[in-house]
């Protein structure tokens, strides 16, 4: 693992804590949920519990995000049926991304700080790009040159077809 920055780096002091935290998109007092309002990229695949979407902008071909069809915030808020479907579906998405080729590993991330609608990211680490292993992959994804949205969407469609 290696940071995508040259030394020396300067460690910042943490900012003052903000309590209570401001509302996120989709929470009372926050902006409307973009997923529920249809403001996100169109789904390339969906079933009764989840929808799969390509990113807008990005540097890693094969990246996709999976959202719950119902407006819930977290794993713990999923219906029992959706929670039971998540694991097998995540495995299928991972296999489909690996099937694109040139992928060393598929990372699964859920941050949840931007919006209150459950979604996870599947991010492929390029084969042989060991400096982007582990927690370094999102940092590298941020600094690598973006690929065309059409290429990202095409890869997402190929992932969907494999499901």
Task: Mark where each language-model region is.
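Active-site microenvironments that recognize anionic phosphate/pyrophosphate groups
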Residues: 1-66
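C-terminal helix-cap and adjacent tail motif
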Residues: 2-18, 25, 126-163
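Short connector loops at helix/strand junctions that flank enzyme active sites
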Residues: 45-47, 59-62, 67, 81, ...
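A short linear hydrophobic-aromatic micro-motif
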Residues: 51-53, 104-109
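Generic beta-structure capping elements
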Residues: 55, 67-69, 123-125
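Histidine-centered divalent-metal-coordination microenvironment in nucleic-acid enzymes
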Residues: 63, 109, 113-139
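Short histidine-centered catalytic/ligand-binding loop motif
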Residues: 64-87, 140-148
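Long, well-ordered alpha-helical scaffolding segments within enzyme catalytic domains
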Residues: 80-100
